[in-house]
């Protein structure tokens, strides 16, 4: 498989656009930070692919967050990213999770929150219930509510690789639902193994060899964590100084860990004094 690449394409004979994402390294970095149960590894892979596909639809520079929450054994699964296709994610759960657990089994009464944060302009947030059998269907529901353009997704993950495909009707005065349904029928024949092993040109040829397809230059997808020593210091400063000094007195240091990438930032007494005096820590230990 071509690793960590998103491809966009257009149908010249229909007002429909498509996306194809294939992920391996970035997926492994997301799920490698914690000992996730297999079903959660698969869910995070699908969520990572979905977020990458959603990110490619952004018409601005900025950030995106796709968050699943609920009152079930999985309380949170989230992928954060930006328009440069830099992604990171985590999940939180309790107890054992069955390999065949459904979305309802995992999240109970759950919902999906998609937050778009432009570098300039107002933030947008959309919320849909996790009341469909698959994550792909829930994302389709989001598009139906927010953009009201016919949209379809196919998401796959197996703990090693993740992939997804996306079709959407372009805004137009004409009715292209028949074209869209035809292309969806073709796309629905895709198999996970094909997405995990073939490059984009081969996949598109197999699916759409009788269609006129224009494939654009590939876009690299990567794992990127935004944690830093400065952010950790800022987080410490929000805590009461006496509480932090009590930790320092007991442990001789204050340690901050990143849930996304497992980086650790260690602050000694001099650092803590500097944080509350100036807002930064002097040391560079990580």
From Swiss-Prot:
CDD domains: Hsp33. The keyword Amino-acid biosynthesis does not apply. Keywords: Chaperone, Cytoplasm, Disulfide bond, Redox-active center, Zinc. Its main location: cytoplasm. Disulfide bonds join 225-227, 258-261. GO terms for cellular component: cytoplasm. It holds the Pfam family HSP33. InterPro entries: Heat_shock_Hsp33, Heat_shock_Hsp33_C, Heat_shock_Hsp33_N, Hsp33_helix_hairpin_bin_dom_sf. One of its GO terms (molecular function) is protein folding chaperone. GO terms for biological process: protein refolding. Under oxidizing conditions two disulfide bonds are formed involving the reactive cysteines. Under reducing conditions zinc is bound to the reactive cysteines and the protein is inactive. It is found in: Cytoplasm. Signal peptide: none annotated. Redox regulated molecular chaperone. Protects both thermally unfolding and oxidatively damaged proteins from irreversible aggregation. Plays an important role in the bacterial defense system toward oxidative stress. Belongs to the HSP33 family. This is 33 kDa chaperonin. It comes from Shewanella sp. (strain ANA-3). The gene is hslO.
């Amino acid at each position: 498989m071509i690793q960590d690449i998103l491809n966009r394409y257009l149908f010249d004979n229909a007002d429909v656009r498509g996306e194809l994402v294939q992920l391996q390294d970035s997926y492994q970095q997301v799920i490698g930070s914690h000992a996730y149960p297999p079903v959660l590894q698969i869910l995070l892979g699908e969520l990572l692919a979905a977020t990458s596909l959603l990110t490619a639809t952004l018409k601005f520079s900025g950030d995106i967050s796709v968050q699943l929450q609920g009152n079930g054994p999985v309380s949170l699964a989230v992928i954060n990213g930006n328009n440069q296709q830099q992604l990171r994610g985590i999940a939180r759960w309790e107890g054992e999770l069955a390999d065949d657990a459904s979305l309802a089994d995992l999240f109970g009464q759950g919902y999906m929150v998609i937050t778009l944060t432009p570098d300039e302009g107002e933030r947008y947030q959309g919320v849909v219930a996790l009341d469909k059998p698959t994550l792909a269907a829930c994302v389709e529901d989001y598009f139906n509510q927010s953009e009201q353009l016919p949209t379809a997704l196919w998401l796959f993950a197996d703990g090693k690789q993740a992939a997804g495909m996306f079709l959407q009707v372009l805004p137009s005065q004409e009715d292209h639902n028949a074209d869209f349904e035809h292309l969806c029928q073709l796309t629905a024949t895709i198999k996970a193994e094909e997405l995990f092993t073939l490059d984009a040109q081969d996949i598109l040829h197999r699916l759409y060899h009788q269609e006129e397809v224009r494939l654009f230059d590939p876009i690299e997808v990567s794992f990127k964590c935004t944690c830093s020593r400065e952010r950790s210091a800022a987080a410490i400063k929000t805590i009461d100084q006496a509480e932090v000094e009590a930790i320092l007195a007991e442990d001789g240091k204050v340690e901050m860990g990143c849930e996304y990438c497992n980086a650790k930032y260690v602050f000694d007494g001099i650092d803590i004094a500097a944080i509350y005096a100036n807002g930064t820590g002097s040391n560079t230990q990580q």
